[in-house]
Protein backbone atom coordinates (compact mmCIF):
# COMPACT_ATOMS: atom_id res chain seq x y z
CA UNK A 1 0.00 0.00 0.00
CA UNK A 2 1.26 3.44 -0.90
CA UNK A 3 1.15 6.21 1.66
CA UNK A 4 1.06 9.87 0.65
CA UNK A 5 2.66 12.63 2.71
CA UNK A 6 2.20 16.35 2.19
CA UNK A 7 5.44 17.85 3.45
CA UNK A 8 6.19 21.57 3.73
CA UNK A 9 8.85 23.05 1.48
CA UNK A 10 11.99 23.87 3.49
CA UNK A 11 14.39 26.75 2.95
CA UNK A 12 16.43 27.06 -0.21
CA UNK A 13 19.61 25.08 0.43
CA UNK A 14 21.17 23.32 3.41
CA UNK A 15 24.09 24.79 5.31
CA UNK A 16 23.89 28.14 3.53
CA UNK A 17 23.35 31.33 5.46
CA UNK A 18 22.53 34.71 4.01
CA UNK A 19 25.74 36.75 4.31
CA UNK A 20 25.48 39.41 6.98
CA UNK A 21 26.52 43.00 6.51
CA UNK A 22 29.52 42.49 8.77
CA UNK A 23 30.83 39.89 6.37
CA UNK A 24 31.24 42.58 3.78
CA UNK A 25 32.47 45.46 5.91
CA UNK A 26 35.92 44.96 4.42
CA UNK A 27 36.38 44.10 0.77
CA UNK A 28 39.35 42.01 -0.29
CA UNK A 29 40.74 41.17 -3.72
CA UNK A 30 41.17 37.49 -4.37
CA UNK A 31 43.73 36.94 -6.77
CA UNK A 32 29.25 21.44 -18.81
CA UNK A 33 26.09 20.57 -16.82
CA UNK A 34 27.29 17.94 -14.42
CA UNK A 35 31.02 17.21 -15.15
CA UNK A 36 32.92 14.42 -13.43
CA UNK A 37 36.66 14.24 -13.16
CA UNK A 38 36.80 11.00 -15.11
CA UNK A 39 35.40 12.72 -18.17
CA UNK A 40 37.91 15.52 -17.83
CA UNK A 41 40.90 13.25 -17.36
CA UNK A 42 39.92 11.07 -20.30
CA UNK A 43 39.58 14.13 -22.49
CA UNK A 44 43.21 14.92 -21.77
CA UNK A 45 44.68 11.43 -21.84
CA UNK A 46 42.83 10.45 -25.02
CA UNK A 47 44.77 13.14 -26.88
CA UNK A 48 47.77 10.81 -26.68
CA UNK A 49 47.70 7.93 -29.16
CA UNK A 50 50.45 5.87 -27.58
CA UNK A 51 52.26 5.59 -24.25
CA UNK A 52 54.98 8.10 -23.51
CA UNK A 53 58.39 6.62 -22.62
CA UNK A 54 59.11 6.88 -18.91
CA UNK A 55 62.88 6.49 -18.95
CA UNK A 56 63.44 9.91 -17.44
CA UNK A 57 61.38 9.20 -14.33
CA UNK A 58 60.87 6.07 -12.27
CA UNK A 59 57.55 5.39 -10.60
CA UNK A 60 58.01 4.96 -6.82
CA UNK A 61 58.42 1.34 -5.74
CA UNK A 62 55.64 1.72 -3.17
CA UNK A 63 52.65 3.25 -4.99
CA UNK A 64 50.07 5.29 -3.10
CA UNK A 65 47.24 4.28 -5.44
CA UNK A 66 46.58 0.72 -4.33
CA UNK A 67 43.81 -1.73 -5.06
CA UNK A 68 41.29 -1.91 -2.22
CA UNK A 69 40.66 -5.13 -0.37
CA UNK A 70 38.04 -7.19 -2.16
CA UNK A 71 34.69 -7.77 -0.42
CA UNK A 72 32.92 -10.87 -1.77
CA UNK A 73 29.34 -11.50 -0.66
CA UNK A 74 28.70 -15.03 0.56
CA UNK A 75 25.10 -14.67 -0.60
CA UNK A 76 25.60 -14.29 -4.36
CA UNK A 77 22.84 -16.48 -5.72
CA UNK A 78 22.07 -14.33 -8.77
CA UNK A 79 25.27 -12.36 -9.47
CA UNK A 80 26.25 -14.64 -12.34
CA UNK A 81 22.67 -14.55 -13.63
CA UNK A 82 22.62 -10.75 -13.63
CA UNK A 83 25.96 -10.41 -15.39
CA UNK A 84 25.89 -13.30 -17.85
CA UNK A 85 22.39 -14.60 -18.48
CA UNK A 86 21.07 -13.48 -21.88
CA UNK A 87 17.43 -13.59 -20.86
CA UNK A 88 18.08 -11.53 -17.73
CA UNK A 89 19.81 -8.91 -19.86
CA UNK A 90 16.95 -8.86 -22.36
CA UNK A 91 14.45 -8.40 -19.54
CA UNK A 92 16.59 -5.67 -17.95
CA UNK A 93 16.82 -3.81 -21.26
CA UNK A 94 13.06 -4.07 -21.66
CA UNK A 95 12.48 -2.59 -18.22
CA UNK A 96 14.84 0.33 -18.85
CA UNK A 97 13.40 0.91 -22.31
CA UNK A 98 9.89 1.05 -20.92
CA UNK A 99 10.89 3.72 -18.40
CA UNK A 100 12.60 5.79 -21.12
CA UNK A 101 9.39 5.72 -23.16
CA UNK A 102 7.59 7.61 -20.39
CA UNK A 103 8.70 11.25 -20.90
CA UNK A 104 9.05 12.54 -17.34
CA UNK A 105 10.49 15.85 -18.52
CA UNK A 106 10.94 18.71 -16.08
CA UNK A 107 11.40 22.38 -16.90
CA UNK A 108 13.22 25.13 -15.02
CA UNK A 109 9.94 26.44 -13.59
CA UNK A 110 7.26 23.97 -12.55
CA UNK A 111 3.96 24.15 -10.62
CA UNK A 112 3.48 22.52 -7.25
CA UNK A 113 2.16 18.97 -7.66
CA UNK A 114 -0.99 19.76 -5.69
CA UNK A 115 -1.72 22.80 -7.86
CA UNK A 116 -1.49 21.07 -11.23
CA UNK A 117 -1.54 17.25 -11.08
CA UNK A 118 -2.11 17.03 -14.84
CA UNK A 119 1.26 18.70 -15.43
CA UNK A 120 2.86 15.65 -13.82
CA UNK A 121 0.73 13.01 -15.54
CA UNK A 122 3.76 11.22 -17.00
CA UNK A 123 5.22 10.82 -13.52
CA UNK A 124 2.06 9.07 -12.34
CA UNK A 125 2.38 6.79 -15.38
CA UNK A 126 5.95 6.02 -14.33
CA UNK A 127 4.79 5.13 -10.82
CA UNK A 128 2.21 2.74 -12.28
CA UNK A 129 4.92 1.29 -14.51
CA UNK A 130 7.09 0.63 -11.46
CA UNK A 131 4.23 -1.18 -9.73
CA UNK A 132 3.75 -3.45 -12.74
CA UNK A 133 7.45 -4.00 -13.46
CA UNK A 134 8.69 -4.61 -9.92
CA UNK A 135 5.87 -6.49 -8.16
CA UNK A 136 8.04 -7.91 -5.37
CA UNK A 137 9.37 -4.46 -4.48
CA UNK A 138 5.84 -3.15 -4.23
CA UNK A 139 4.56 -6.07 -2.19
CA UNK A 140 7.48 -6.32 0.27
CA UNK A 141 8.65 -2.71 0.67
CA UNK A 142 6.82 0.18 2.23
CA UNK A 143 6.08 2.71 -0.52
CA UNK A 144 5.40 6.34 0.40
CA UNK A 145 4.75 9.38 -1.74
CA UNK A 146 6.22 12.58 -0.37
CA UNK A 147 4.90 15.82 -1.86
CA UNK A 148 2.76 13.71 -4.21
CA UNK A 149 5.58 12.63 -6.53
CA UNK A 150 8.67 11.90 -4.45
CA UNK A 151 8.96 8.13 -4.02
CA UNK A 152 10.30 6.61 -0.83
CA UNK A 153 10.79 2.84 -0.70
CA UNK A 154 11.69 1.25 2.64
CA UNK A 155 12.85 -2.34 2.98
CA UNK A 156 12.69 -2.88 6.72
CA UNK A 157 15.63 -4.79 8.14
CA UNK A 158 15.44 -7.31 10.94
CA UNK A 159 17.76 -5.23 13.15
CA UNK A 160 16.42 -1.68 13.60
CA UNK A 161 19.52 -0.67 15.56
CA UNK A 162 21.64 -0.74 12.39
CA UNK A 163 21.98 2.34 10.21
CA UNK A 164 20.09 2.02 6.91
CA UNK A 165 21.65 2.07 3.45
CA UNK A 166 20.22 4.88 1.34
CA UNK A 167 20.11 4.72 -2.45
CA UNK A 168 19.08 7.75 -4.49
CA UNK A 169 18.15 8.61 -8.08
CA UNK A 170 15.72 10.96 -9.82
CA UNK A 171 12.67 10.26 -11.94
CA UNK A 172 12.87 13.38 -14.11
CA UNK A 173 14.83 14.03 -17.28
CA UNK A 174 15.80 17.18 -19.13
CA UNK A 175 13.42 18.05 -21.98
CA UNK A 176 14.18 16.97 -25.52
CA UNK A 177 14.41 19.89 -27.94
CA UNK A 178 11.68 19.11 -30.47
CA UNK A 179 13.39 21.30 -33.07
CA UNK A 180 16.33 18.90 -33.29
CA UNK A 181 14.37 15.68 -32.76
CA UNK A 182 15.50 14.44 -36.18
CA UNK A 183 19.15 14.79 -35.14
CA UNK A 184 18.82 11.74 -32.92
CA UNK A 185 20.07 8.45 -34.34
CA UNK A 186 16.98 6.82 -32.83
CA UNK A 187 13.85 8.59 -31.54
CA UNK A 188 14.71 10.12 -28.14
CA UNK A 189 11.76 8.56 -26.34
CA UNK A 190 11.95 5.16 -27.99
CA UNK A 191 14.26 3.36 -25.59
CA UNK A 192 15.60 1.61 -28.69
CA UNK A 193 18.11 -1.18 -28.15
CA UNK A 194 20.74 -1.71 -30.84
CA UNK A 195 22.05 -5.24 -30.44
CA UNK A 196 25.07 -4.59 -32.65
CA UNK A 197 26.42 -1.78 -30.44
CA UNK A 198 24.77 -2.99 -27.20
CA UNK A 199 23.41 0.53 -26.67
CA UNK A 200 20.06 1.57 -25.24
CA UNK A 201 19.09 4.96 -26.69
CA UNK A 202 16.89 7.73 -25.35
CA UNK A 203 16.49 10.59 -22.93
CA UNK A 204 17.20 9.42 -19.42
CA UNK A 205 19.08 6.31 -20.53
CA UNK A 206 22.22 7.67 -18.84
CA UNK A 207 20.78 10.39 -16.56
CA UNK A 208 19.49 8.71 -14.64
CA UNK A 209 16.69 6.25 -15.29
CA UNK A 210 19.44 3.69 -15.68
CA UNK A 211 20.46 4.09 -12.02
CA UNK A 212 16.87 4.24 -10.81
CA UNK A 213 15.98 1.02 -12.63
CA UNK A 214 19.20 -0.67 -11.49
CA UNK A 215 18.35 0.06 -7.86
CA UNK A 216 14.81 -1.24 -8.19
CA UNK A 217 15.92 -4.29 -10.17
CA UNK A 218 18.72 -5.16 -7.78
CA UNK A 219 16.30 -5.14 -4.85
CA UNK A 220 13.68 -7.04 -6.87
CA UNK A 221 16.20 -9.80 -7.57
CA UNK A 222 17.26 -10.05 -3.94
CA UNK A 223 13.61 -10.48 -2.99
CA UNK A 224 13.16 -13.12 -5.70
CA UNK A 225 16.15 -14.96 -4.22
CA UNK A 226 14.51 -14.96 -0.80
CA UNK A 227 17.06 -12.62 0.74
CA UNK A 228 16.17 -10.98 4.05
CA UNK A 229 18.08 -7.84 4.86
CA UNK A 230 19.26 -7.33 8.41
CA UNK A 231 19.87 -3.64 7.75
CA UNK A 232 17.07 -1.40 6.47
CA UNK A 233 17.44 -0.37 2.82
CA UNK A 234 15.90 2.90 1.61
CA UNK A 235 15.39 4.12 -1.94
CA UNK A 236 14.66 7.86 -2.30
CA UNK A 237 13.60 9.08 -5.76
CA UNK A 238 13.19 12.79 -6.40
CA UNK A 239 11.31 14.19 -9.36
CA UNK A 240 12.86 17.57 -10.19
CA UNK A 241 16.63 17.15 -9.84
CA UNK A 242 17.13 18.77 -13.23
CA UNK A 243 15.58 21.97 -11.85
CA UNK A 244 17.52 21.86 -8.56
CA UNK A 245 15.27 19.48 -6.65
CA UNK A 246 13.22 22.18 -4.93
CA UNK A 247 10.07 20.05 -4.66
CA UNK A 248 11.56 16.56 -4.69
CA UNK A 249 14.82 15.92 -2.85
CA UNK A 250 14.41 19.15 -0.91
CA UNK A 251 11.30 17.66 0.68
CA UNK A 252 12.39 14.03 0.83
CA UNK A 253 15.60 14.76 2.73
CA UNK A 254 14.04 16.56 5.72
CA UNK A 255 11.31 13.91 5.77
CA UNK A 256 14.02 11.27 6.26
CA UNK A 257 15.92 13.47 8.70
CA UNK A 258 12.86 13.83 10.89
CA UNK A 259 12.21 10.09 10.82
CA UNK A 260 15.75 8.80 11.37
CA UNK A 261 17.72 11.73 12.77
CA UNK A 262 21.09 13.25 11.83
CA UNK A 263 23.96 11.04 10.63
CA UNK A 264 21.53 8.12 10.63
CA UNK A 265 22.50 6.48 7.31
CA UNK A 266 25.35 4.00 6.91
CA UNK A 267 25.99 5.38 3.43
CA UNK A 268 24.28 7.25 0.62
CA UNK A 269 24.71 6.22 -3.04
CA UNK A 270 23.53 8.55 -5.81
CA UNK A 271 24.21 9.27 -9.48
CA UNK A 272 27.78 10.10 -10.38
CA UNK A 273 30.83 8.86 -12.21
CA UNK A 274 31.64 5.28 -13.16
CA UNK A 275 34.67 3.41 -14.43
CA UNK A 276 37.07 5.00 -16.88
CA UNK A 277 39.30 2.90 -19.09
CA UNK A 278 42.53 4.88 -19.20
CA UNK A 279 44.36 2.46 -21.44
CA UNK A 280 44.10 -1.15 -22.57
CA UNK A 281 44.38 -2.68 -19.11
CA UNK A 282 43.83 0.16 -16.63
CA UNK A 283 40.45 1.08 -15.17
CA UNK A 284 39.81 3.73 -12.54
CA UNK A 285 36.53 3.93 -10.66
CA UNK A 286 36.18 7.46 -9.30
CA UNK A 287 33.34 7.57 -6.81
CA UNK A 288 32.56 11.27 -6.51
CA UNK A 289 32.94 12.18 -2.85
CA UNK A 290 32.88 15.99 -3.17
CA UNK A 291 30.95 18.68 -5.02
CA UNK A 292 31.70 22.35 -5.56
CA UNK A 293 29.47 25.01 -4.06
CA UNK A 294 27.13 27.36 -5.89
CA UNK A 295 26.02 30.96 -5.77
CA UNK A 296 24.40 33.38 -8.20
CA UNK A 297 25.09 37.08 -7.73
CA UNK A 298 22.63 39.52 -9.25
CA UNK A 299 24.30 42.85 -10.04
CA UNK A 300 22.29 45.89 -11.11
CA UNK A 301 23.44 49.31 -12.29
CA UNK A 302 20.75 51.84 -11.34
CA UNK A 303 20.80 55.11 -13.29
CA UNK A 304 18.26 57.80 -14.12
CA UNK A 305 17.51 57.27 -17.78
CA UNK A 306 16.71 60.17 -20.07
CA UNK A 307 16.92 60.98 -23.77
CA UNK A 308 19.90 59.47 -25.55
CA UNK A 309 20.69 62.80 -27.22
CA UNK A 310 21.93 64.00 -23.82
CA UNK A 311 24.31 61.23 -22.98
CA UNK A 312 26.38 60.73 -19.82
CA UNK A 313 30.00 59.65 -20.04
CA UNK A 314 28.85 56.08 -19.51
CA UNK A 315 25.37 54.61 -19.63
CA UNK A 316 24.36 51.91 -17.17
CA UNK A 317 25.08 49.42 -19.94
CA UNK A 318 28.58 50.84 -20.31
CA UNK A 319 29.24 50.67 -16.56
CA UNK A 320 27.93 47.11 -16.46
CA UNK A 321 30.14 46.19 -19.40
CA UNK A 322 33.25 47.53 -17.69
CA UNK A 323 32.42 45.66 -14.50
CA UNK A 324 31.92 42.45 -16.45
CA UNK A 325 35.21 43.05 -18.26
CA UNK A 326 37.06 43.52 -14.97
CA UNK A 327 35.55 40.38 -13.44
CA UNK A 328 36.26 38.20 -16.47
CA UNK A 329 39.84 39.43 -16.71
CA UNK A 330 40.53 38.83 -13.03
CA UNK A 331 39.47 35.21 -12.45
CA UNK A 332 39.78 33.46 -9.12
CA UNK A 333 43.18 32.04 -8.19
CA UNK A 334 43.94 28.38 -8.75
CA UNK A 335 44.06 26.38 -5.53
CA UNK A 336 45.30 22.85 -6.11
CA UNK A 337 45.55 21.27 -2.67
CA UNK A 338 46.52 17.64 -2.40
CA UNK A 339 43.36 16.85 -0.47
CA UNK A 340 41.35 17.73 -3.58
CA UNK A 341 39.83 14.42 -4.74
CA UNK A 342 41.09 14.95 -8.27
CA UNK A 343 44.64 14.48 -6.99
CA UNK A 344 43.81 10.86 -6.11
CA UNK A 345 42.71 10.21 -9.69
CA UNK A 346 45.77 11.91 -11.14
CA UNK A 347 47.97 9.92 -8.77
CA UNK A 348 46.47 6.64 -9.98
CA UNK A 349 46.94 7.70 -13.59
CA UNK A 350 50.55 8.71 -12.92
CA UNK A 351 51.45 5.49 -11.12
CA UNK A 352 49.71 3.01 -13.37
CA UNK A 353 49.24 4.58 -16.81
CA UNK A 354 51.86 5.21 -19.47
CA UNK A 355 49.97 7.98 -21.22
CA UNK A 356 51.09 10.98 -19.19
CA UNK A 357 54.32 12.79 -20.15
CA UNK A 358 57.21 12.04 -17.75
CA UNK A 359 57.44 15.58 -16.38
CA UNK A 360 53.72 15.57 -15.58
CA UNK A 361 53.94 12.16 -13.89
CA UNK A 362 56.89 13.34 -11.84
CA UNK A 363 55.05 16.50 -10.81
CA UNK A 364 52.02 14.48 -9.70
CA UNK A 365 53.97 11.91 -7.72
CA UNK A 366 56.44 14.30 -6.08
CA UNK A 367 53.91 17.03 -5.30
CA UNK A 368 53.40 15.87 -1.67
CA UNK A 369 57.08 16.46 -0.83
CA UNK A 370 58.23 19.04 -3.37
CA UNK A 371 56.71 22.53 -3.46
CA UNK A 372 58.22 23.16 -6.89
CA UNK A 373 56.60 20.03 -8.32
CA UNK A 374 53.30 21.05 -6.77
CA UNK A 375 53.57 24.34 -8.64
CA UNK A 376 54.25 22.45 -11.88
CA UNK A 377 51.19 20.29 -11.20
CA UNK A 378 49.04 23.35 -10.62
CA UNK A 379 50.31 24.91 -13.84
CA UNK A 380 49.57 21.67 -15.69
CA UNK A 381 46.00 21.57 -14.42
CA UNK A 382 45.49 25.30 -14.98
CA UNK A 383 46.61 24.99 -18.61
CA UNK A 384 43.86 22.52 -19.51
CA UNK A 385 40.38 24.08 -19.76
CA UNK A 386 38.69 20.77 -18.96
CA UNK A 387 40.54 20.39 -15.67
CA UNK A 388 41.34 23.88 -14.43
CA UNK A 389 37.87 24.71 -13.18
CA UNK A 390 38.07 21.87 -10.65
CA UNK A 391 40.82 23.74 -8.76
CA UNK A 392 39.28 27.20 -8.55
CA UNK A 393 36.02 29.06 -8.16
CA UNK A 394 34.47 29.85 -11.52
CA UNK A 395 32.61 32.99 -12.51
CA UNK A 396 30.37 33.18 -15.59
CA UNK A 397 28.07 36.01 -16.63
CA UNK A 398 25.08 34.12 -17.99
CA UNK A 399 22.17 36.59 -18.09
CA UNK A 400 22.07 40.32 -18.90
CA UNK A 401 19.23 42.81 -19.40
CA UNK A 402 19.33 46.53 -20.12
CA UNK A 403 17.63 49.17 -22.21
CA UNK A 404 14.20 49.30 -23.80
CA UNK A 405 14.51 51.71 -26.74
CA UNK A 406 17.19 52.96 -29.11
CA UNK A 407 16.76 56.65 -28.21
CA UNK A 408 16.26 56.19 -24.45
CA UNK A 409 19.08 55.93 -21.94
CA UNK A 410 18.90 52.65 -19.99
CA UNK A 411 17.82 53.47 -16.46
CA UNK A 412 18.65 49.97 -15.28
CA UNK A 413 21.06 47.32 -16.46
CA UNK A 414 21.33 44.06 -14.57
CA UNK A 415 23.16 40.79 -15.00
CA UNK A 416 23.56 37.50 -13.18
CA UNK A 417 26.94 35.98 -12.38
CA UNK A 418 26.97 32.24 -11.78
CA UNK A 419 29.72 30.78 -9.59
CA UNK A 420 30.79 27.23 -8.84
CA UNK A 421 32.61 27.56 -5.55
CA UNK A 422 35.95 25.79 -5.04
CA UNK A 423 35.88 23.10 -2.35
CA UNK A 424 38.43 25.07 -0.30
CA UNK A 425 36.52 28.35 -0.58
CA UNK A 426 33.08 29.52 0.55
CA UNK A 427 30.04 31.42 -0.65
CA UNK A 428 31.03 34.45 1.43
CA UNK A 429 34.55 34.54 0.02
CA UNK A 430 33.17 34.27 -3.50
CA UNK A 431 30.66 37.09 -3.09
CA UNK A 432 33.29 39.28 -1.42
CA UNK A 433 35.36 39.03 -4.58
CA UNK A 434 32.46 40.21 -6.74
CA UNK A 435 31.79 43.00 -4.28
CA UNK A 436 35.40 44.12 -4.47
CA UNK A 437 35.21 44.64 -8.23
CA UNK A 438 31.82 46.34 -7.95
CA UNK A 439 33.36 48.80 -5.49
CA UNK A 440 36.28 49.47 -7.84
CA UNK A 441 33.87 50.39 -10.64
CA UNK A 442 31.50 52.32 -8.35
CA UNK A 443 34.34 54.51 -7.06
CA UNK A 444 35.77 55.02 -10.55
CA UNK A 445 32.48 56.25 -12.03
CA UNK A 446 30.96 57.96 -9.00
CA UNK A 447 28.17 55.50 -8.20
CA UNK A 448 26.84 54.36 -4.86
CA UNK A 449 27.07 50.72 -3.81
CA UNK A 450 24.76 48.43 -1.83
CA UNK A 451 24.82 44.79 -0.86
CA UNK A 452 21.33 43.54 -0.07
CA UNK A 453 20.10 46.18 2.43
CA UNK A 454 23.54 47.42 3.44
CA UNK A 455 24.69 50.79 2.08
CA UNK A 456 28.42 50.59 1.40
CA UNK A 457 28.68 53.82 -0.61
CA UNK A 458 25.73 56.25 -0.48
CA UNK A 459 23.80 56.74 -3.70
CA UNK A 460 25.03 59.62 -5.87
CA UNK A 461 23.34 61.78 -8.47
CA UNK A 462 24.35 59.19 -11.08
CA UNK A 463 22.79 56.28 -9.21
CA UNK A 464 24.11 53.17 -7.48
CA UNK A 465 25.27 49.60 -8.05
CA UNK A 466 23.47 46.87 -6.12
CA UNK A 467 24.52 43.29 -5.44
CA UNK A 468 22.44 40.43 -4.08
CA UNK A 469 23.43 36.79 -3.65
CA UNK A 470 20.96 34.06 -4.56
CA UNK A 471 20.73 30.25 -4.49
CA UNK A 472 23.63 29.84 -2.11
CA UNK A 473 25.16 26.43 -1.53
CA UNK A 474 28.43 25.84 0.28
CA UNK A 475 30.82 23.20 -1.11
CA UNK A 476 29.76 19.73 -0.06
CA UNK A 477 31.51 18.08 2.86
CA UNK A 478 34.19 15.76 1.48
CA UNK A 479 33.27 12.16 2.22
CA UNK A 480 36.11 9.94 3.45
CA UNK A 481 38.05 7.60 1.17
CA UNK A 482 39.34 5.57 4.08
CA UNK A 483 37.74 3.78 6.97
CA UNK A 484 35.21 1.00 7.29
CA UNK A 485 32.33 2.39 5.20
CA UNK A 486 34.58 3.34 2.30
CA UNK A 487 36.37 -0.02 2.42
CA UNK A 488 33.13 -1.94 1.93
CA UNK A 489 32.03 0.35 -0.88
CA UNK A 490 35.40 0.27 -2.69
CA UNK A 491 35.83 -3.45 -2.01
CA UNK A 492 32.46 -4.19 -3.58
CA UNK A 493 33.39 -2.21 -6.69
CA UNK A 494 36.77 -3.95 -6.80
CA UNK A 495 35.26 -7.41 -6.56
CA UNK A 496 32.52 -6.74 -9.09
CA UNK A 497 34.83 -5.45 -11.80
CA UNK A 498 38.21 -7.06 -11.08
CA UNK A 499 36.94 -10.55 -10.25
CA UNK A 500 33.68 -10.78 -12.18
CA UNK A 501 33.09 -8.36 -15.05
CA UNK A 502 36.74 -8.17 -16.17
CA UNK A 503 37.71 -11.64 -14.97
CA UNK A 504 38.50 -12.87 -18.47
CA UNK A 505 40.78 -9.89 -19.08
CA UNK A 506 43.61 -11.39 -17.04
CA UNK A 507 45.85 -8.32 -17.14
CA UNK A 508 43.10 -5.85 -16.22
CA UNK A 509 43.80 -3.62 -13.22
CA UNK A 510 41.02 -1.79 -11.37
CA UNK A 511 41.61 1.00 -8.85
CA UNK A 512 38.99 2.87 -6.83
CA UNK A 513 39.41 6.53 -5.86
CA UNK A 514 37.38 9.55 -4.89
CA UNK A 515 36.35 12.20 -7.40
CA UNK A 516 34.90 15.68 -7.77
CA UNK A 517 31.85 17.16 -9.49
CA UNK A 518 31.73 20.78 -10.54
CA UNK A 519 27.94 20.53 -10.61
CA UNK A 520 25.54 19.41 -7.89
CA UNK A 521 23.28 16.42 -7.45
CA UNK A 522 20.28 15.93 -5.19
CA UNK A 523 22.73 14.86 -2.46
CA UNK A 524 23.10 18.55 -1.55
CA UNK A 525 19.97 18.15 0.56
CA UNK A 526 21.13 14.94 2.27
CA UNK A 527 24.38 16.07 3.93
CA UNK A 528 22.87 15.85 7.40
CA UNK A 529 21.97 12.18 6.96
CA UNK A 530 25.45 10.74 6.46
CA UNK A 531 29.12 11.63 6.22
CA UNK A 532 29.53 8.85 3.65
CA UNK A 533 28.03 10.07 0.38
CA UNK A 534 29.31 8.48 -2.83
CA UNK A 535 28.05 9.48 -6.26
CA UNK A 536 28.70 6.47 -8.44
CA UNK A 537 27.10 4.35 -11.15
CA UNK A 538 28.73 0.93 -11.51
CA UNK A 539 29.41 0.83 -15.23
CA UNK A 540 32.23 1.35 -17.71
CA UNK A 541 31.46 4.59 -19.52
CA UNK A 542 33.37 5.65 -22.65
CA UNK A 543 33.95 9.36 -23.08
CA UNK A 544 31.71 9.62 -26.16
CA UNK A 545 28.86 8.13 -24.15
CA UNK A 546 29.20 10.64 -21.31
CA UNK A 547 29.16 13.55 -23.75
CA UNK A 548 25.59 12.71 -24.77
CA UNK A 549 24.11 13.34 -21.32
CA UNK A 550 21.63 16.26 -21.59
CA UNK A 551 22.34 16.24 -25.33
CA UNK A 552 21.44 14.59 -28.61
CA UNK A 553 21.82 10.79 -28.82
CA UNK A 554 21.94 10.05 -25.11
CA UNK A 555 22.64 6.34 -24.72
CA UNK A 556 24.12 3.72 -22.43
CA UNK A 557 25.70 0.31 -22.83
CA UNK A 558 23.28 -2.40 -21.76
CA UNK A 559 26.22 -4.29 -20.26
CA UNK A 560 27.03 -1.28 -18.08
CA UNK A 561 23.42 -1.17 -17.00
CA UNK A 562 23.33 -4.77 -15.79
CA UNK A 563 26.64 -4.25 -13.99
CA UNK A 564 24.92 -1.46 -12.03
CA UNK A 565 22.17 -3.93 -11.11
CA UNK A 566 24.83 -6.37 -9.89
CA UNK A 567 26.49 -3.66 -7.80
CA UNK A 568 23.25 -2.84 -5.97
CA UNK A 569 22.72 -6.55 -5.32
CA UNK A 570 26.25 -7.12 -4.02
CA UNK A 571 26.53 -3.89 -2.06
CA UNK A 572 23.38 -4.53 -0.04
CA UNK A 573 24.62 -8.02 0.84
CA UNK A 574 28.16 -6.87 1.63
CA UNK A 575 27.02 -4.11 3.98
CA UNK A 576 24.81 -6.65 5.75
CA UNK A 577 27.64 -9.18 6.02
CA UNK A 578 30.61 -6.92 6.75
CA UNK A 579 29.21 -3.62 7.98
CA UNK A 580 29.27 -2.48 11.57
CA UNK A 581 28.11 0.84 13.03
Curated annotation (Swiss-Prot):
Co-factor: note: Binds 2 Zn(2+) ions per subunit.
SUPFAM superfamilies: Bacterial exopeptidase dimerisation domain, Zn-dependent exopeptidases
Superkingdom, natural source: Eukaryota
Residues given in the record as Zn(2+) 1 binding sites: 207, 242, 550
GO BP annotations, alphabetical order: proteolysis
Membrane topology classification: Single-pass type II membrane protein
Cross-referenced Pfam families: M20_dimer, Peptidase_M20
UniProt KW keywords: Carboxypeptidase, Glycoprotein, Hydrolase, Isopeptide bond, Membrane, Metal-binding, Protease, Signal-anchor, Transmembrane, Transmembrane helix, Ubl conjugation, Zinc
Residues bearing attached sugar chains per UniProt: 54, 76, 335, 428
Cytoplasmic side: 1-29
Binding site for Zn(2+) 2: 170, 207, 270
EC number: 3.4.17.-
GO cellular component: membrane
Cofactor annotation: Zn(2+)
Subcellular location: Membrane
MF GO annotations: metal ion binding; metallocarboxypeptidase activity
Active site: 172, 241
Residue location of crosslink Glycyl lysine isopeptide (Lys-Gly) (interchain with G-Cter in ubiquitin): 17
InterPro entries: ArgE/DapE_CS, Bact_exopeptidase_dim_dom, Pept_M20_carboxypep, Pept_M20A, Peptidase_M20, Peptidase_M20_dimer
Membrane topology, Extracellular segments: 47-581
Main location: membrane
Database matches in CDD domains: M20_yscS
This protein's name: Putative carboxypeptidase YOL153C
Amino acid sequence: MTETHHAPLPDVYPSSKQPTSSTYSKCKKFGLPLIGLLTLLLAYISSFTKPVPNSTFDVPASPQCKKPQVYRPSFNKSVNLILNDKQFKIDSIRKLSGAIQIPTEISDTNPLPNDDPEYYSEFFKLHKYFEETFPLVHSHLKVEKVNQLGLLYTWEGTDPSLKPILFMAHQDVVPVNREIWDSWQYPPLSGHYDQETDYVWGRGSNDCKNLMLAELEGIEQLLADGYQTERTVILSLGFDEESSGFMGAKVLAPFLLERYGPDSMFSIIDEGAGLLRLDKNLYIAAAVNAEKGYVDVRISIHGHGGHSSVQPDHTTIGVASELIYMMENHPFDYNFSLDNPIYDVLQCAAEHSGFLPPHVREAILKAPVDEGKRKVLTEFAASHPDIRDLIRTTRAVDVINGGVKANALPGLTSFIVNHRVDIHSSVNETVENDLYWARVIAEKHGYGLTFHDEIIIPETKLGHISLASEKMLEPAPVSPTSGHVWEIFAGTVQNLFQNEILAEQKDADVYVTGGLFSGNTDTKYYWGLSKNIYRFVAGIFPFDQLRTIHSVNEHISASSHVSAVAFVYEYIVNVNEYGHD
